[in-house]
Amino acid sequence: MAMDGYLWMVILGFIIAFILAFSVGANDVANSFGTAVGSGVVTLRQACILASIFETTGSVLLGAKVGETIRKGIIDVNLYNDTVVTLMAGEVSAMVGSAVWQLIASFLRLPISGTHCIVGSTIGFSLVANGTKGVQWMELVKIVASWFISPLLSGFMSGVLFVLIRMFILTKEDPVPNGLQALPLFYAATIAINVFSIMYTGAPVLGLSLPIWAIALISFGVALLFAFFVWLFVCPWMRRKIAGKLEKESALSRTSDESLSKVQEVESPFKELPGAKASDDSAVPLTNPTGEAVGPSEGTSTGNHPRTAYGRALSMTHGSAKSPISNGTFSFEGHMRNDGHVYHTVHKDSGLYKDLLHKIHVDKGPEEKLSQENNYRLLRRNNSYTCYTAAICGMPVHTTFRATDASSAPEDSEKLVGDTVSYSKKRLRYDSYSSYCNAVAEAEIEAEEGGVEMRLASELADPDQPHDDPTEEEKEEKDTAEVHLLFHFLQVLTACFGSFAHGGNDVSNAIGPLVALWLIYEQGGVMQEAATPVWLLFYGGVGICTGLWVWGRRVIQTMGKDLTPITPSSGFTIELASAFTVVIASNIGLPVSTTHCKVGSVVAVGWIRSRKAVDWHLFRNIFVAWFVTVPVAGLFSAAIMAIFMYGILS
């Protein structure tokens, strides 16, 4: 059949396929590196660079297998033997429907399944073209079943792996020996899974034809070699690195203790920090470590040399003043301006912001019950330094309290302070930057002397509410510095392989219809017997990477931070188990959802770490989206197909 007259449809298909790949990159790639970014092992820029490499490689080596299922496994293409153009229009409609819904979801920061989109879109155009007889319902049932099997299987595997890691490494008094012994095994397992996948699926692309036992033997051999390399070189290097870090932290702690021992208590309503103005508007003098005064030029230097003020060491790095206190309970960063003041901004995602938010007591009347989201709004609405200072000093913040109230009626603010708060703090203004800095400094000193946490707890506790110790469900496990180093690079490696698996699985969602469209145009028939062209898979990989760079960060926040807190150890288990599930599914040609696998692993590990750590409201929304995506994408596709059949092609 002559297809020259329908070249415009092929060109349109290439354009829409790139947009579809863009939407896949903007939405689904967050599944691969979201946890790595959330745990802090890589920055967003580094994640984009690594994902671009591994997504493209995975799409070329693994994408052809799943593409066949998307092209032929959902509908019966033989029904279009006499209406080839109708099938071409259907493939274009499927890409439009899937792309539109994924772009909308990305704009709304809603993580959805790209597999759901393309399956729903394919069914949508088939229902318009041939009714229900065009759909292979048993194949659809298998695919729908895989949507539930994949999160359960991935979650189970992640949970078992995390329990083992916690039992043999995390809960040990010294996790380093067991962790170093397990590193070769972890690396070997990661390498073996992905080498087997490449050899099993990518061998035909590379011109190789090997039996499965040979592929398994090669994978096992490569994993053993890599494990030996890790044991011989990586483990000793990691041991030295951990020992050096612990020694450095010990030295910093001793330095901090020596500095704090020189602090002379000054009985004053409040103390000014370096960079702030004194009460008489004179500049606060700074002294160097030898006790000599330094001039203004030195006070605003951006060098890395330390300085001491009121007996407390401060270090300047690129104009930022950082507290040297090593316990990490309170910390602040300032930025120097020309007027000599140090200005501080607390961001919503910072640890200090969240720490202060937990310490603020919000008065709730019987007629006003504020949700957690309203608590955040209250903290942002009330002048930041007012709320922060009040939180540190133990002053409950009422919903009607404003910064102007504190300055205009200081006696009213005293009424809001509990009896346990010291007299000096009762007389302290809460609406200035100086008072905020003084409160932070005082709290840091008291924290080093001990008892500050108990003091804060007693000051901020509601007298009408009994104090409850955190239950086992509310406790959240934290990675120590040694564990963080052990799993740091390991999570990066598993995230890279997870991105590799995602490229192999989800490139078919964007390129599967385009491959069908191209093969129909090239061969003039619907059987599509030729192999998937590698250059089309590469084209899809480029589109996915473009979407990641432009819009990917919107959904990374949801997967990496909002659903549950991620640590390097938990992130490793999530990445490895979900990647294993996706790679196995890709090799058997089952289009599972990487979103479902990752969500299942994140929820399972988060639930094991802490019963209250999982955002079940967000999980419910994601679960609902699994059901909404198929019909919505199908409706978009059906609408476009109706335009083709009853308008353009009629």
From Swiss-Prot:
The modification Phosphoserine is found at S253, S256, S259, S268, S315, S384. One of its GO terms (biological process) is positive regulation of bone mineralization. Residues 27-46, 105-109, 164-192, 235-482, 552-571, 610-621 are cytoplasmic. GO terms for molecular function: sodium:phosphate symporter activity; virus receptor activity. Its main location: membrane. It catalyses: 2 Na(+)(out) + phosphate(out) = 2 Na(+)(in) + phosphate(in). Residues 1-5, 68-83, 131-142, 213, 504-530, 587-593, 643-650 are extracellular. Residues 268-310 are annotated as: Disordered. One of its GO terms (cellular component) is plasma membrane. It is a multi-pass membrane protein. Homodimer. This is Sodium-dependent phosphate transporter 2.
